Design a protein with these regions (language model features):
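Charged, low-complexity intrinsically disordered regions
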Residues: 2-21, 28-215
């Protein structure tokens, strides 16, 4: 776009930024920094080797929002290590086109007795009774349903390139493809993590003690 004669260079830069904002919305830094300020978290700007992230203290746990590249794709993820005394695992994602096929091939899909939730989500766990107890919370189901794209799980450490977890420590994990810049969805994810950790403690599936690992 040509610079108008009456504009100085700063005016032109602001105009270009305004047009880009109209086309693509606010940038990741702007959204994540505002989110951190609202939820009393810490925004950490990225550099050459490490991307930006938001770190929130939730009781004895740290919930970390960042991005990761995998197979030339970018994913937004949230992670929260916690003490998992019984090794409870689950994985929840939205039902998609091929979900029915995988069920026909014998893939696990636990039903919790809530018709709409069972219709919309695929649930896997090493303890079906316990995951039903977790999802008996209406707030848990509401926070999960709020997310249009979700892969939510308890898993062990991130392998060779991630932090190594002590014995008995696992992490609550969320990811979706792309860079998530929707303020309300991001805020809802932090609420989801806080609610899940609280429910796991009530169930005896998490301890309210620091996990002894930093991401």
């Amino acid at each position: 776009m040509a610079t108008l004669d009456y504009q100085n260079r700063d005016d032109a830069a602001r105009e270009r930024k305004g047009i880009l904002r109209q086309l693509f919305g606010p940038c990741q830094k702007e959204v994540w920094a505002a989110l951190a300020a609202e939820i009393d978290a810490r925004y950490e700007a990225g550099g050459w080797w490490k991307g930006s992230r938001v770190v929130a203290e939730v009781g004895p746990w740290q919930v970390t929002l960042d991005t990761v590249r995998r197979d030339k794709l970018v994913f937004t993820r949230l992670r929260a290590p916690f003490v998992n005394p019984e090794g409870f695992r689950f994985r929840i994602h939205r039902r998609h086109l091929f979900s029915g096929l995988t069920e026909m091939l014998g893939a696990q899909d636990i039903e919790i007795g809530e018709a709409q939730f069972d219709r919309d989500f695929v649930i896997k766990s090493n303890d079906p009774a316990r995951v039903r107890q977790l999802l008996a919370s209406p707030r848990m189901r509401l926070l999960l349903d709020w997310q249009p794209r979700i892969h939510f799980a308890v898993r062990d450490d991130g392998g060779w390139f991630g932090a190594k977890f002590p014995q008995g420590v696992d992490e609550l994990y969320f990811e979706c493809i792309g860079v998530l810049k929707d303020h309300e969805l991001l805020k809802g994810l932090f609420d989801l993590f806080a609610e899940t950790l609280e429910q796991l403690c009530i169930m005896g599936s998490a301890y309210e003690t620091p996990p002894g690992v930093t991401l």
